């Protein structure tokens, strides 16, 4: 990801299928301090091999769901980002 401005380290948490595909429960990534949710999602999908579930992922920034992928996200050092696929079960 090319960032023209300042960047910060963000903790990424993976759940369910995203954890399986990323092959890790957590990671740290460097992201711009301001980015759209779509740009962020595209970067994470590419970096962690989540293409097969991209269209079904939910993102949460510091435990708040990101409802609109056109929203701009403002990150601070050490923020948390959760990648949550839809859960299934019975």
UniProtKB/Swiss-Prot annotation:
Positions where 1-thioglycine occurs in the chain: 90
Keyword Magnesium: no
Pfam families, sorted: ThiS (PF02597)
Residues carrying Glycyl adenylate: 90
InterPro entries: Beta-grasp_dom_sf, MOCS2A, MOCS2A_euk, Mopterin_synth/thiamin_S_b, ThiS/MoaD-like
Function statement: Acts as a sulfur carrier required for molybdopterin biosynthesis. Component of the molybdopterin synthase complex that catalyzes the conversion of precursor Z into molybdopterin by mediating the incorporation of 2 sulfur atoms into precursor Z to generate a dithiolene group. In the complex, serves as sulfur donor by being thiocarboxylated (-COSH) at its C-terminus by MOCS3. After interaction with Mocs2B, the sulfur is then transferred to precursor Z to form molybdopterin. Involved during biosynthesis of the molybdenum cofactor.
Recorded family membership: Belongs to the MoaD family. MOCS2A subfamily.
Quaternary state and interactors: Heterotetramer; composed of 2 small (Mocs2A) and 2 large (Mocs2B) subunits.
More info: This protein is produced by a bicistronic gene which also produces the large subunit (Mocs2B).
Protein name per Swiss-Prot or TrEMBL: Molybdopterin synthase sulfur carrier subunit
UniProt source species: Drosophila melanogaster
């Amino acid at each position: 990801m090319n960032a023209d401005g300042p960047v910060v380290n963000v903790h990424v948490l993976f759940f369910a299928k995203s954890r399986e595909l990323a092959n890790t429960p957590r990671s740290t990534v460097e992201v711009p301090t301001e980015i759209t949710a779509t740009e962020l999602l595209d970067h994470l999908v590419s970096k962690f091999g989540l293409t097969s579930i991209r269209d079904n992922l939910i993102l949460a920034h510091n435990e708040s769901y990101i409802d609109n992928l056109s929203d701009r996200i403002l990150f601070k050092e050490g923020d948390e980002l959760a990648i949550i696929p839809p859960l299934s079960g019975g």
